[in-house]
Structures are given as C-alpha cells and as structure tokens.
Amino acid sequence: MSKEVHEERAPRTVEDVKEMLVKHSNGEIQRTIQNCITILQDDHVLADAIRLNLLSERTDIVKPVGWPRSGKTLNDTDMKYILRRMEKYGISSEKKIESAIRIVANENRYHPIRDYLNGLQWDGTERIPHVLHHFLGAAEDEYTCEAMKI
C-alpha cells in the first residue's frame, strides 16, 4: 500500500457519500471525475478496493465487493458492476468513471512482492557469509563473504 498517499477512511453509506459530492445550484449531483473519485474512495462497497499493481501494471480489486469474481484484476464485468454502483449516485459517464478508477488506482498503488518482503521480520541468522558455499560449493572464507556484500 502506498503509505504516502493512502489514508484510512471510514467507508460511508450511499446517502453519506451523496452529501459529500459537489452539486449544481439546483441540488443535482455534478457528473465530474472528482465526484467519481469521492465515490470510489468513500462508498462502503468500493472504498479501498481499487489499487494499481506495480508488478503486473494492472488495476486490481483487492477486497470483496459484493459480486462474484474469478481473480484480482479488474475486468469488463467488474466495470459493469462499478457502473451500476455509480448509477446510485446519478453518475453514468463511463469515460469519467474509468478516468476516476485510473486516478484512484494510481493513488493506491502497491507492489505485492515488495510489500511481502518489507513485511518480513529478520530472524537474526547471518546468511551472507555462507551463501556462496551453500549454493556453489565455494570456500567459506573472508574473500567469499566480502564478495557477497558487493
């Protein structure tokens, strides 16, 4: 998770999110990319669900969103469900919704391997001095240890 950009938010109901959206003077919700972003970030179904996977360079849905899914990567069927969800807010512009999804995903990018490795705790066992010996049968001496540090 991109800790620099991502903030924890409490997911809100449709009515709560509608109150947050920018409206015209007549009270009608404006159909803007920014309103789409607000919905994607705060709607209780979509909040924290859409992220850019830096390893695959694809947009992923990373939490249950209330419809059947077969994998993590955002697909056409997911888009149809998201469009249907956005209609609850009076927004149906597929281009604006797609733009908002790209922005939200980019702001919540992650790298699954880096995140996994950064989450590991070192067990305190020194391995560098022994790696060349273990994998290549090299002598365990100061030279091979220093060579591994390079």
Predicted regions and their residues:
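P-loop NTPase catalytic core of nucleic-acid-dependent motor ATPases
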Residues: 104-150
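Intein modules and their embedded homing endonuclease domains
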Residues: 2-123
